[in-house]
C-alpha cells in the first residue's frame, strides 16, 4: 500500500468511516441521477419488459 502514511495524519477510526461514507453518498447520487434522467431504468427495476423499438436486419 503506497498510501500507508496517511494514517499518521488521520486516525483510521475517523478516516475509514469518512471514506466509506463518501463512497456511499457518491453511489446514491449516481443512482438518483440515472433514475431521474432516464425513463427505462425505473421500469426495469419494477420488472417491466423492454419494448423493442426497431428491428435489426442482418445480411
UniProtKB/Swiss-Prot annotation:
Family per record: Belongs to the antenna complex alpha subunit family.
Protein name as annotated: Light-harvesting protein B-800-850 alpha chain A
Subunit structure: The core complex is formed by different alpha and beta chains, binding bacteriochlorophyll molecules, and arranged most probably in tetrameric structures disposed around the reaction center. The non-pigmented gamma chains may constitute additional components.
Residue ranges that the UniProt entry lists as topological domain Cytoplasmic: 1-11
Xref: Pfam families: LHC (PF00556)
Topological relation to the membrane, as annotated: Single-pass type II membrane protein
Stretches that traverse the bilayer: 12-35
Outcome (variant: residue 48 to P): In strain: 2.6.1 / French
GO molecular function, one term: electron transporter, transferring electrons within the cyclic electron transport pathway of photosynthesis activity
Function: Antenna complexes are light-harvesting systems, which transfer the excitation energy to the reaction centers.
Compartments (UniProt record): Cell inner membrane
GO cellular component assignments: organelle inner membrane; plasma membrane; plasma membrane light-harvesting complex
Keywords, in A-Z order: Antenna complex, Bacteriochlorophyll, Cell inner membrane, Cell membrane, Chlorophyll, Chromophore, Light-harvesting polypeptide, Magnesium, Membrane, Metal-binding, Transmembrane, Transmembrane helix
GO BP terms in the entry: photosynthesis, light reaction
Species name: Rhodopseudomonas palustris (strain ATCC BAA-98 / CGA009)
Topological domain spans for side Periplasmic: 36-59
Binding site for a bacteriochlorophyll: 31
Amino acid at each position: 500500500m503506497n498510501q500507508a502514511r496517511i494514517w499518521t495524519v488521520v486516525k483510521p477510526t475517523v478516516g475509514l468511516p469518512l471514506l466509506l461514507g463518501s463512497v456511499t453518498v457518491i453511489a446514491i447520487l449516481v443512482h438518483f441521477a440515472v433514475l431521474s434522467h432516464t425513463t427505462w431504468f425505473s421500469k426495469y427495476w419494477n420488472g417491466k419488459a423492454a419494448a423493442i423499438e426497431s428491428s435489426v436486419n442482418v445480411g
